[in-house]
Amino acid sequence: MARRKKGAPLNGVMVVDKPQDWTSNAVLQKVKYALNAQKAGHTGALDPLATGVLPLCFGEATKFSQLLLDSDKEYVTCAYLGRTTTTSDADGDIIAESPVPGLSVSDLESVLGKFRGNLKQIPSMYSALKHKGTPLYKLARQGIEVEREARDIIIHELELLDYTPPFLRLRVLCSKGTYIRNLVEDIGQVLGCGAHVMELRRTRCGPFSLADSVEFVSFADESGRQAAAEKYKERLLPIDSSVQQFSEIILDEANTGSIIQGQTVKISPLSSEGKVRLYTNRRHFIGLGEVMSDGTVKPVRLLNVSALSAE
């Protein structure tokens, strides 16, 4: 007999505004406990120093978490020019200090232009990437540095928001895998004075922005847990909120049954190939499909319909 899962079945997405000095996993576990949820996962860690958009997926929504991990992210950061640290942010020890040259807006824009578009970025030793199974930050804390391969990233937008020496405020829209700490440090190096991140706030992750977020609530007792749970439940978004970038297809009853059984179906007319959201004729989301070149639709990632009906 299968072991009964602890907690209540809960399906959906919640966007939490992560507070400073909390790890992403600690926030996830606190919210999961508040809701007594069976299954939950976050969609890309933020550094403890960072705040902002942290989407949490519950139950069947975890099937689509990789799409959020792979999505573009937007950040607003405050860089401190003239000082570099061991971790490239304010949590690290100071390595070096240099005078900040007189910089005009034109000077700054000229340098920022070098960091827009397709770039190669070497991940920081103070990151969660693993080397032979060990997170790099654990090696760094032991004074061990290993070679890291440069990774392809895209800086879609890099906007100068304000410059009040030594503070430089930037808005960054970037691809997955971009380390803002590294970006800021590299900008400081080109400016000739060094830099590190003082503040970092994620303002968007895929389709979700701060407007979708709920304030994180910590608690120390059962009454506090219940109050937090009520607040969180009010802001639980439907499973398909994380896949709104794809067009939708409404299936008739016969095609719904075929798709659920893993079969490919013929639907016409279809405008283009690629992933699509699949719904029953009663507007119930059942998962993602893919439109093939021959006009057929095959299931890609489907919900467990029985799990949804058990809620």
Curated annotation (Swiss-Prot):
Upper taxonomic lineage: Bacteria, Pseudomonadati, Pseudomonadota, Gammaproteobacteria, Oceanospirillales
Highest taxon in the source lineage: Bacteria
Record field: transmembrane: none
GO annotation terms (biological process): mRNA pseudouridine synthesis; tRNA pseudouridine synthesis
Stated role: Responsible for synthesis of pseudouridine from uracil-55 in the psi GC loop of transfer RNAs.
Catalysed reactions, semicolon-separated: uridine(55) in tRNA = pseudouridine(55) in tRNA
InterPro entries xrefs: PsdUridine_synth_cat_dom_sf (IPR020103), PsdUridine_synth_N (IPR002501), PUA-like_sf (IPR015947), PUA_sf (IPR036974), tRNA_psdUridine_synth_TruB (IPR014780), tRNA_sdUridine_synth_fam1_C (IPR015240), TruB_C (IPR032819)
Protein name: tRNA pseudouridine synthase B
Active-site residue list: D47 (nucleophile)
Species name: Hahella chejuensis (strain KCTC 2396)
